[in-house]
Amino acid sequence: MATTNSFTILIFMILATTSSTFATLGEMVTVLSIDGGGIKGIIPATILEFLEGQLQEVDNNTDARLADYFDVIGGTSTGGLLTAMITTPNETNRPFAAAKDIVPFYFEHGPKIFQSSGSIFGPKYDGKYLMQVLQEKLGETRVHQALTEVAISSFDIKTNKPVIFTKSNLAKSPELDAKMYDICYSTAAAPTFFPPHYFATNTSNGDKYEFNLVDGAVATVDDPALLSISVATKLAQVDPKFASIKSLNYKQMLLLSLGTGTTSEFDKTYTAEETAKWGTARWMLVIQKMTSAASSYMTDYYLSTAFQALDSQNNYLRVQENALTGTTTELDDASEANMQLLVQVGEDLLKKSVSKDNPETYEEALKRFAKLLSDRKKLRANKASY
């Protein structure tokens, strides 16, 4: 179903683009999307640290933060946590976490978040420490206070519907103005890993509105890029600063999508003959990795095709490691050794080519992207001053 919905969104965006003209850089909408993947969030965190450093260098401003440059930041699961960390304001109304603070956060708190509950029944982890640290870091901040538009997904197991937390939806659905720590726990509450999360807010007329939520990947798979694009499309329709954009399309968008790594080989390959007699229990051991890798590949395929078809391929950058091995493939191995390996994966990824057809390294591509983000921010600021 997620693949069908993704394809529908893709077709809609292509059709909307056919009658449009090229956008100037100052009119472009900028989108950052961060995949889910548990402790593997260290990989995109390493990439974000590099990008924020480049933005600071280009603009000669050590206080520059990612939220200053992106109109929409979307994330699922651990990507939702990263989204909250770089968009939640501190007491001076700046992001409470710089990108360089995220990897140390994983090292400090990861081992306690992924500490086994010791029970053979129920979820693998009780989630108590995760909630504790989220409340400590995010405080009472709610969605409307985010420093830029956010798109954090979850899934309500009582209504069987996805729930998308965004600022632009609040006028219509004020009950979505939840506390950020409730949202972050919910998007990370992967079935079998953490308990589902219940909390309540109020509707516009004061009625109680209840949520029963699990991991956002249930609703949007691990790659939330298409979700983030959808939110950007709506934002362009309602935000006055995008008044010059009559119909948002790929020519008017800069999209950076960060993965948490996958593997083309898994831990083992299988044949049809070998798996013919497998039952539910045996498939459950491997299906999550298979579906996660496949859905991530298909989303990237859709987006690459759309941007290339409209001669806007430089507007989209997917940063993904496709050759994870061993413990780095695990969502919950928060050992010191494995976390160090994940940092190394992120650092090594910067030196790799974007694709077989594009010899540009990710490091070079991100430097180019940083320059585009900086130039676009300056153009918009100049336009606003008139």
UniProtKB/Swiss-Prot annotation:
Places the protein is found: Vacuole
GO function term, MF aspect, one: nutrient reservoir activity
GO CC annotations on file: vacuole
UniProt domain PNPLA: residue ranges: 32-229
Motif (DGA/G): 215-217
Any Pfam family matching the protein: Patatin
Glycan attachment points: N60, N90, N202
Primary enzyme class: hydrolase
Span(s) of short sequence motif GXSXG: 75-79
TM ranges: none
PROSITE patterns registered for this protein in UniProt: PNPLA (PS51635)
Keyword field: Glycoprotein, Hydrolase, Lipid degradation, Lipid metabolism, Plant defense, Signal, Storage protein, Vacuole
General function of this protein: Probable lipolytic acyl hydrolase (LAH), an activity which is thought to be involved in the response of tubers to pathogens.
Listed PANTHER family: PATATIN GROUP D-2, XYLOSE ISOMERASE
Protein's name according to its UniProt entry: Patatin-T5
Species this chain originates from: Solanum tuberosum
Lineage of origin: Eukaryota, Viridiplantae, Streptophyta, Embryophyta, Tracheophyta
